[in-house]
Swiss-Prot record:
Gene giving rise to this polypeptide: galc
Protein's name according to its UniProt entry: Galactocerebrosidase
Primary localization: other
Keyword Lipid metabolism in record: yes
Subcellular location: Lysosome
Positions of glycan attachment: N125, N361, N385, N390, N500, N540
Signal peptide: 1-22
Residues the record lists as binding substrate: T91, W133, N179, R378
Any Pfam family the entry gives: Glyco_hydro_59_C
Biological processes per GO annotation: galactosylceramide catabolic process
Swiss-Prot/TrEMBL keywords: Disulfide bond, Glycoprotein, Glycosidase, Hydrolase, Lipid degradation, Lipid metabolism, Lysosome, Signal, Sphingolipid metabolism
């Protein structure tokens, strides 16, 4: 018994000793500096991740943009990376190309131009990056490969960069190759040549937006390729790099990272990798996929953004924890600052980085995220331990004379569920060139000489609510601000506002599917085009739309309800699809591909004439009207039980839609 008492006392003393004794860390620029900091950013696209953002009414849309881009307000991002739209499915939808066809150029399609302008308006120094996920079909000459004609691909990409400047006064700083797909050395060299020939010497190339290898090996053995590439960009590197990448002396970036549900564990993931991407892997930029979760949440990777803005119909948005975790770094350091060599891991878990502008300013960011509270979506996270600890930082070199540091703290507090983020504490007085902190687990601290930090706020946005049960759009917009109609989320193909000059009647302004050739794809696009809309929970509803086929004999269009899949799974989407064809037939199918037929027959429909389709789904039965008259009824629908409404075409073909309406009971 006495032995046990002595043991207990000794154990308590040991624990107290471990906690009370502060480990010491030196922050010193005399020993030399580390790598130049290039910034923290967000990625819009790859794909259609900002689709719903553009539909927000003011002031809410501007408030969201302020939280993302406005300096000293929210995330204060240094980098905006966007998809160079390629008319193909690239995760959560398609983004339109500026060149659907070889003789076509339109630099006002989509919303990435607008987003870059808004970012630049708030932060003129923001770095802009463009990267293709897919390419229009003509670039590949009918093959699902962009490198057989590298001169065409290079000219296509460069035209996007030139258009950004000519039409929007946007200087693109970096361009990538082909997101997470094979690179081609010949193409990269030709891209560099084409950029230079076009007066774009300042535009730098990132390669290859995939894994560290094989691009690193290729750079080591091909000097001409090495001369063309400025940044090695890796995706989801797990905070580590490879020796060969370090040997190249190139900038190393985590050019896509995070991709994690933006709850507090997601915030913890972001906190850990923002520090440890440099501590472990010497990566000087980290870019979040995605910038803002502004797409239907039931599409793939719902809420995997720095914040959430998925309800333009209510105006509701949520400033999630990753916004404030970002601010711990972005509000107190800028691209061009330099990491100290004295960065690293804390003895009892966690990490610290320090940056300087070489003009006397110092910013230190500390994170103590535990394993289970910082798991990212990928790669797998090996076990590690973090415990409460005291730490002492000794300021050396040019920092020895610092007398005061501003302090900002975030505490996740998974135990009591009372977290707080980006809280300004009292300034820390420095005594004898050192200071001591008591760190708990799952915290983030910033200590800095910069005094301009601010936790920006706006009045609470409107409360959350479902998509309207009664919805109508006649597309009568003479001068639309964007090329796409609100709330429609294209999943294969591109649906654009169209002025139908051949129809002086009620269908002058329509929505038109415009992609006529399978693109060079990134995901597995459907063979049919489809755009979804509404509430994924919808079960019993009526969908009505006027349709106009533009392909004789083989043309076909549909309206649909209960569509259960989008994104990279769109080919396998099920639902209730009501098709009419230009050969005078109709079909009702339980799937997009059209294999499971629920009803079929003659419709008398032809191309180049308007027809009104009405689909009602109630319980296990579906009924269809053509031009207001019953065409088929009581088709048995065993599943799915719920899903979006949709419109689309039988193939990559031109077709128009007008007066789209939904009336849902649930």
């Amino acid at each position: 018994m006495i032995y046990k008492l002595y043991f207990a006392i000794a154990l308590c003393f040991s624990l107290c000793f471990d906690l009370c004794i502060a480990e010491s860390y030196v922050l010193d620029d005399k020993v030399g500096l580390g790598r130049t900091f290039d910034g923290i950013g967000g990625l819009s696209g790859g794909g259609a991740t900002s689709r719903l953002l553009v539909n927000y009414a003011e002031p809410y849309r501007s408030q969201i943009l302020d939280y993302l881009f406005k300096p000293n307000f929210g995330a204060s991002l240094h980098i905006l990376k966007v998809e160079i739209g390629g008319d193909a499915q690239t995760t959560d939808g398609t983004e339109p190309s500026h060149m659907h066809y070889e003789n076509d150029e339109n630099f006002f399609r989509g919303y990435e131009w607008w987003l870059m302008r808004e970012a630049k308006k708030r932060n003129p120094n923001i770095t802009l990056i463009g990267l293709p996920w897919a390419f229009p079909g003509w670039v590949g000459h009918g093959k699902n490969w962009p490198y057989d004609f590298p001169d065409i691909t290079a000219s296509y990409v460069v035209s996007w960069i030139l258009g950004a400047k000519h039409y929007h006064d946007l200087n693109i700083d970096y361009v990538g190759i082909w997101n997470e797909r094979n690179f081609d050395s010949k193409y990269i060299k030709l891209l560099r040549y084409t950029l230079d020939k076009s007066g774009l010497e300042r535009v730098r190339i990132i390669a290859s937006d995939n894994l560290w290898q094989p691009i690193t090996y290729s750079l080591c053995v091909d000097q001409e390729l090495a001369d063309a590439v400025d940044v090695i960009g890796a995706h989801y590197p797990g905070t580590t790099t490879v020796i060969e990448a370090l040997k190249t002396q190139k900038k190393l970036w985590s050019s896509e990272d995070y991709s994690t549900f933006n709850d507090e564990v997601g915030g913890g993931c972001w906190a850990r990798i923002l520090n440890q991407n440099y501590v472990n892997g010497l990566m000087t930029a980290t870019i979040s996929w995605n910038l803002v979760a502004s797409y239907y949440e039931d599409l793939p990777f719902g809420r995997d953004g720095l914040m959430t803005a998925e309800e333009p119909w209510t105006g509701n948005y949520v400033v999630e924890s990753p916004i404030w975790i970002t601010a711990h770094t972005t509000q107190f350091s800028q691209p061009g600052w330099t990491y100290l060599q004295t960065v690293g891991h804390l003895v009892h878990g966690g990490s610290y980085v320090a940056l300087t502008d070489s003009n006397g300013n110092l910013t230190v960011v500390i994170e103590t995220m535990t394993h289970d509270h910082s798991v990212c979506i990928r790669p797998p996270l090996l076990p590690f331990n973090v415990t409460a600890q005291n730490v002492t930082f000794q300021l050396k070199g040019s920092f020895a004379l610092i007398k005061e540091l501003q302090v900002w703290q975030s505490r996740f507090d998974f135990k009591t569920k009372k977290p707080f983020f980006f809280k300004k504490l009292s300034p820390l007085k420095i005594s004898d060139g050192s200071f001591t902190l008591s760190l708990d687990v799952d915290e983030v601290y910033t200590l800095t000489t910069i005094s301009t930090g601010l936790k920006g706020t706006y009045p609470d946005p409107p409360t959350s609510g479902p998509f309207p049960k009664v919805y109508f759009d006649d597309f009568n917009v003479a001068n639309p601000s964007f090329s796409e109609a609100p709330d429609f989320a294209d999943q294969t193909g591109v649906f654009e506002y169209y002025i139908n000059l051949t129809d002086p009647g009620p269908h002058v302004f329509t929505l038109r599917q415009v992609v006529t050739q399978m693109p060079v794809t990134w995901a597995t696009d459907a063979d049919q085009t489809i755009s979804v809309i509404g509430d994924y929970k919808w079960q019993n509803l009526t969908v009505t739309c006027d349709v106009f086929m533009e392909t004789v004999k083989t043309g076909g269009v549909f309206i649909a309800a209960r569509v259960d899949k989008g994104g990279q799974s769109v080919r396998s989407a099920k639902g209730v699809f009501f098709w009419v064809f230009a050969d005078g037939s109709y079909k009702v199918t339980n799937d997009l591909v059209g294999k499971t037929v629920l009803a079929e027959g003659l419709s008398g429909t032809r191309a180049y004439g308007w027809h009104t389709l009405t689909l009602t789904v109630e319980g296990q039965y579906a009924t269809g009207l053509l031009n207001g008259y019953p065409l088929w009824k009581d088709a048995v629908v065993l599943g799915p039980k719920n899903g979006w409404a949709a419109i689309g075409t039988h193939s990559f073909e031109l077709a128009q839609f007008d007066n789209f309406a939904v009336e849902a009971k649930l």
